[in-house]
From Swiss-Prot:
Transcription recorded as keyword: no
Pfam families, alphabetized: EFG_C, GTP_EFTU, GTP_EFTU_D2, LepA_C
Gene: lepA
Record-given protein name: Elongation factor 4
Regions that span the bilayer: none
Keyword line: Cell inner membrane, Cell membrane, GTP-binding, Hydrolase, Membrane, Nucleotide-binding, Protein biosynthesis
Membrane topology (UniProt): Peripheral membrane protein
Assigned EC number: 3.6.5.n1
Family listed: Belongs to the TRAFAC class translation factor GTPase superfamily. Classic translation factor GTPase family. LepA subfamily.
InterPro entries documented for this protein: EF-4, EFG_III/V, EFG_V-like, EFTu-like_2, G_TR_CS, LepA_C_sf, LepA_CTD, LepA_IV
Organism this protein belongs to: Nitrobacter winogradskyi (strain ATCC 25391 / DSM 10237 / CIP 104748 / NCIMB 11846 / Nb-255)
GO annotation terms (biological process): positive regulation of translation
Known role: Required for accurate and efficient protein synthesis under certain stress conditions. May act as a fidelity factor of the translation reaction, by catalyzing a one-codon backward translocation of tRNAs on improperly translocated ribosomes. Back-translocation proceeds from a post-translocation (POST) complex to a pre-translocation (PRE) complex, thus giving elongation factor G a second chance to translocate the tRNAs correctly. Binds to ribosomes in a GTP-dependent manner.
Positions with a binding annotation for GTP: D19, H20, G21, K22, S23, T24, N138, K139, V140, D141
Length: 603
């Protein structure tokens, strides 16, 4: 039996910006409560970040959970359930469901860097879930740490009292015992009724080669027992529970989980897509009818085409995507073909980091070499006959004459930056058609709120923001609504043929600059052929930019010494005819580098 008195359970998550020491603090808590022995911890950083990419980039992608036992100073034994949540905006939905499973949060802030944009976003989510929040200042042993200033900042920006914030250094373990005591004394226990009908929240799920789908749950009411039959309200599928248990971070099996507890179950579920995150699990024999509040399915925001560089890898790519989908239900894909790139997939992602990580996992775990087309967003179009359509691939755009109005998605962005870079950050937002909403100062840092079109952000906004602010600015966004926009479909023509992989929807005012930059880049990278190749950027039938790749010259008159000029002219005319014919029928080989470079062009 695992069941602990509900008053001695504490469910909490750690909220922090990337790199503020969240996973390191989790390591220390596990070590000090004896979750793993020192030998098992040795040489392992970030125990909860199980993917290589998570460790390398120092970010948490999947939510993880661990149960710790702690004997407090009052002599009682407590059970802590720690949910390690992702810190990045793309994984905000993973954060929201992890927070819904907890009653309190530790807010970790780097004492040398202060509050960042994503700290704000996640704290507001925690406050929305009525969490009790304990501020923790990490890295206080650094020479650059300014704890008093950061405390003031927490109070000014977030509006929670930070006077009794816990001072720690997660790396050395300084102050971590105080965190354990604060969890006991300052965070509330869960509520729940053991005798009520079973009601549990599905927090996360992942695929395990041996066990099938492992489902992470938080029991709200009732008890979840091994061998019982459960039903998911969202998909109305029923399963027999095979295993029940929790992580310490190792898997430990038990007979049942009671109210307020967090653990896992396995039930011969075949696909992660069958387990919707945020779904409600109940008893199949006497089900509850209403779902737990506040969950929505993850909707892809950014789309792009992924094509294998080597056409023979297509089947491998298809299998790899299926495997990734097992673990990441928010990632969607469908097959597409491109005249330039062959067979591939059109994929949907939650945001740019998600796109980058999926791409990196495909190339790293499955050894695939991929080309990604330009990222695009979902546009809404009202046609002249009153029909409304949504498109996420510029190739599918109907004829201009049939379109009455195009609408594009807008976001609200919150940007925090040191004062000295404010000018260049504001200029960047202005260049990207941003509309400033507010500008406030927090100590020596400025906080700007902007409305921006998502179209302008998906491309390379984050990279540009980091470069104009020397890496100091942080950025967070959420979708707001759709607004009408003057967008045009720009195509790149090589030797008069449109290259489908390079067509994109751009704002009319930006089309010329974008088109010119792309054709110049293509000109550098397409090798000369026997005939000259025009590279054009066009909107409809109007060419807005053009470059020409000069032909290779073969000296056909070399074998004529002296003699009549008409002989030379005849040979030159013949060559001219041949080149003309070649230009008509010749095929231009566009190297992969040219695609990749054209897609990475700056405006």
């Amino acid at each position: 039996m695992t069941t602990s008195p509900i008053a001695n359970i504490r469910n909490f998550s750690i909220v922090a910006h990337i790199d503020h020491g969240k996973s390191t603090l989790a390591d220390r808590l596990i070590q000090m409560t004896g979750g793993l022995s020192d030998r098992e911890m040795a040489g392992k950083e970030q125990v909860l970040d199980s993917m290589d990419i998570e460790r390398e980039r120092g970010i948490t992608i999947k939510a993880q959970t661990v149960r710790l036992k702690y004997r407090a100073k009052d002599g009682k034994d407590y059970v802590f359930n720690l949910m390690d949540t992702p810190g990045h905006v793309d994984f905000a939905y993973e954060v929201s469901r992890s927070l819904a499973a907890c009653e309190g949060s530790l807010l970790v802030v780097d004492a040398s860097q202060g509050v960042e944009a994503q700290t704000l976003a996640n704290v507001y989510q925690a406050l929305d879930n009525n969490h009790e929040i304990v501020p923790v200042l990490n890295k206080v042993d650094l020479p650059a740490a300014e704890p008093d200033k950061v405390k003031q900042q927490i109070e000014d920006v977030i509006g929670i009292d930070a006077s009794d914030a816990v001072m720690i250094s997660a790396k050395t373990g300084l102050g971590v015992p105080d965190v354990l005591e604060a969890i006991v004394t300052r965070l509330p226990p869960p509520k729940g009724d053991r005798d009520a009908t079973l009601k549990a929240l599905l927090v996360d799920s992942w695929y395990d080669v041996y066990l099938g789908v492992v489902v992470l749950i938080r029991v709200i009411d009732g008890a979840l027992r091994k061998g019982s039959r459960i039903r998911m309200i969202g998909t109305s599928a029923a399963y027999d529970v095979e295993r029940v248990g929790f992580f310490t971070p190792k898997m430990q099996q038990v007979d049942e989980l009671g109210p307020g507890e967090i653990g896992f179950i396995t039930a011969a579920i075949k696909e992660v897509a069958d387990t919707r995150v945020g779904d409600t699990i109940t008893d199949d024999r006497k089900p509850v009818t209403e779902m737990l509040p506040g969950f929505k399915p993850a909707i892809p925001v950014v789309f792009c085409g992924l094509f294998p560089v080597d056409a023979d890898d297509f089947e491998t790519l298809r299998a790899a995507m299926g495997k990734l989908r097992l673990n990441d239900a928010s990632f969607s894909f469908e097959m597409e073909t491109s005249a330039a790139l062959g067979f591939g997939f059109r994929c949907g992602f939650l945001g740019l980091l998600h796109l980058e990580i999926v791409q990196e996992r495909l190339s790293r775990e499955f050894d695939l070499n991929l080309i990604a087309t330009a990222p695009s967003v979902i546009y809404r179009m009202r046609l002249t006959d009153g029909v409304e359509i949504e498109i996420h691939n510029p190739i599918d755009m109907p004829d201009v004459v049939k379109i009455a109005e195009i609408q594009e998605p807008w976001i609200e962005a919150t940007i925090l930056t040191p004062d000295e870079y404010l000018g260049s950050v504001l200029k960047l937002c202005q260049d990207r058609r941003g509309v400033q909403k507010e500008l406030t100062y927090v100590g020596a840092r400025a906080m700007a709120k902007y409305d921006l079109p998502l179209n302008e952000v998906v491309f390379d906004f984050y990279d540009r923001l980091k470069s104009v602010s020397k890496g100091y600015a942080s950025f967070d966004y959420h979708l707001t609504d759709y607004k009408p926009a003057d967008l045009v479909k720009m195509q790149i023509l090589v030797n008069g043929e449109p290259v489908d992989a390079l067509s994109m929807l751009v704002h009319r005012t930006r089309a010329e600059g974008r088109g010119r930059a792309m054709v110049e880049k293509m000109k550098e990278l397409i090798p000369p052929h026997m005939f000259q190749i025009p590279i054009q950027a066009a909107i409809g039938g109007k060419v807005i930019a053009r470059e020409t790749v000069r032909a290779l010259r073969k000296d056909v008159t070399a074998k004529c010494y002296g003699g009549d000029v008409s002989r030379k002219r005849k040979l030159l005319e013949k060559q001219k005819e041949g080149k003309k014919k070649m230009r008509q029928f010749g095929k231009v080989d566009i190297p992969q580098e040219a695609f990749i470079a054209a897609l990475k062009v700056d405006n």
